[in-house]
């Protein structure tokens, strides 16, 4: 049995490694496949696939998109996306525009308190990256404003806080719909990170399942064993396929390793095969 990681990020969004470097890390970790699930962009997928072909690591083209649920930002993963789909790209372009408008407001609020950044501090070595709160947090650490990325998030970048207004709302059903129309597999990412409580978490998952969502991220670096067991039960009750991944970012989340998370995560390639058959029921069909 092989192992996979179906939730990773590159420097096309808020990861610190290039797509090719990410694939090299996956190879070194002994993984047979990874999904590249950058925020609101498919820009890194082609480079990841090229590196995967060279190294013998399967690359599942993916995406992570943010929506809103009762005042909380939630994330939905798309796996086996078709990145060249014009309708998907138009949707992601709109999502990036919404993100950029929020970024501008974050920068305005921080500047009012004397905190400013250069483009080099934010973009690093990739001028095409999708700027996220993680980029701002890393820049704060580099400037000595905060001692860690976690401190920057807690003090300045908490969702809905003084410096970080919510993004313009996107209904999660709209995200599921665009992913299904694309032929992708849609799954709610890290359900317990939203701190909704069991009842509201179940309600959210049920609502998205009713909208056609096929999966649930049952295994994640942030989960305690009890949480994974609860999610297993929720997924089974709604006939959702489980997925799992580390949510690897590199330096933004230095305690998380690709493939193993904080040390106890292992995702079987059998989960990947179930997902593959869900979106491509005919064996051998290209994704």
Regions found by a protein language model. Name each.
Residues 54-206, 262-286:
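Extended substrate/RNA-proximal surfaces in nucleic-acid metabolism proteins
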Residues 239-245, 250-276:
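C-terminal active-site subregion of NodB/CE4 polysaccharide deacetylases
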Residues 1-72, 156-159, 170-183, 187-253:
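An N-terminally biased module of ancient metal coordination in phosphate/nucleic-acid-related enzymes
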């Amino acid at each position: 049995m092989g192992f996979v990681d179906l939730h990773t990020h590159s420097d096309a969004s808020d990861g610190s490694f290039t797509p090719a470097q990410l694939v090299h890390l996956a190879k070194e970790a002994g993984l047979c496949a990874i999904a590249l699930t950058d925020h609101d962009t498919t820009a890194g997928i082609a480079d990841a696939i090229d590196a995967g072909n060279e190294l013998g690591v399967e690359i599942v083209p993916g995406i992570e998109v943010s929506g809103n649920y009762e005042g909380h930002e939630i994330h939905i993963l798309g796996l086996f996306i078709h990145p060249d789909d014009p309708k998907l790209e138009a949707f992601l372009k709109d999502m990036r525009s919404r993100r950029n408008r929020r970024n501008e407001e974050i920068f305005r609020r921080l500047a009012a308190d004397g905190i400013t950044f250069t483009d080099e501090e934010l973009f690093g070595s990739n001028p095409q990256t999708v700027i996220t709160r993680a980029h701002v947090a890393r820049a704060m650490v580099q400037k000595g404003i905060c001692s860690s990325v976690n401190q920057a998030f807690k003090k300045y970048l908490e969702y809905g806080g003084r410096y970080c207004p919510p993004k313009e709302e996107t209904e999660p059903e709209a995200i599921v719909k665009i992913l299904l129309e694309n032929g992708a597999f849609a799954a709610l990412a890290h359900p317990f990170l939203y701190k909704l409580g069991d009842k509201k978490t179940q309600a959210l998952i049920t609502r998205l399942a009713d909208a056609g969502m096929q999966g649930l991220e049952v295994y994640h670096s942030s989960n305690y064993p009890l949480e994974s067991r609860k999610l297993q039960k929720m997924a089974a009750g709604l006939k959702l396929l489980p997925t799992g991944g580390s949510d690897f970012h590199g330096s933004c989340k230095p305690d998380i390793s690709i493939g193993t998370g904080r040390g106890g995560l292992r995702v079987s390639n059998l989960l990947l095969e179930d997902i593959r058959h869900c979106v491509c029921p005919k064996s051998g069909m290209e994704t």
